[in-house]
Amino acid sequence: MIHRKTQAQWFGFSVLYFFLFLAGLHSAQAAAGSPTKVVLTVGAVSEREGVLYVALDQGFFRKHGVDLTLVQVRSGPIGIAALSSGESQLNWGSVSAANLGAIAEGADLVFVASFINKLTGNVVSNPRIRNPPELKGKSIGINSLGGGAWIFTMLTLDYWGLVPERDKIQFRALGDQSVIAQGVLGGTVDAAFLGYTYGKILESKGFRILADVEKLPIPYQGSGLLAQRGFAASSPGTIENVLRALLDSLAFIHNPANKPQVMKSLAKGLRLKRVEDAGDGYQIMLGLYEKKIYPNVDGIGNVIRLLGQSNEKIRRLKAAELVDDSVVRKLEKEGRL
């Protein structure tokens, strides 16, 4: 079980230090007088975030007039807190308990684009676990309660007919993907939902891949951009330029001549010791992203259904009302998608 007091204290300190960092960042920006500053938070570290790493390394944001600061946060709730308070303008993430819970409590947030409209990754376990039913009574590593890895895991368990409370499946909040992978490797937890890069690394060490969840028919709204509804309405040009940069990044990723640079960016983003360890992640990235980056209303609705079973406020949310795809529609009319 997660030690709630320790987790709450860590979350409080993380939020405090994060906001102090952003306050200093905004002060420096004001002094410099630079245009179109954007702070984008991200709580995950996997090949799903590769499009961000490449866009930064190749200067695509600056090409489109955006000075973007990518801030890695420990968990989704910290990123949502920053977005809700206006300390950041965008959050990269998937539909989760963190953002749906915040919206249910009054945060006016919307998905403005989605680059991955499916569950992706591996459920990895120690070799003694041979199939999903044997997860009963075991521990699973996650980044945080309510975060992306948690909801990925919950949706997969739901598909398998497993209920954590009934089946005595425990969650342990460990941190980002690299820490979770170490937790499985070292026996701290019995299993975890991991991105393909870390999943392949553990498989090479004898651990079992219980599922490649991309092959399971689970509707989902995956990695995309969230903004405050007011920001989406008042600054559509900024969102448009961020999306143009990310579309340039996708085109760069899919050009075979750029493989060495893409792998280098991915290895750096995933904190891999060797660039060659990003090879599997690179191959996955080639088939990972959507051609049309519309938010997935059905996928959002599926998570509302799951979480709404135990949260009345979330159950009352309407998926279609959590989307503002006006900028994406404009880009499609221009032929960019």
Where in the sequence are the language-model features?
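Pocket-lining segment of extracytoplasmic ligand-binding domains
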Residues: 97, 178-270
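Secondary-structure end/capping motifs
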Residues: 233-315
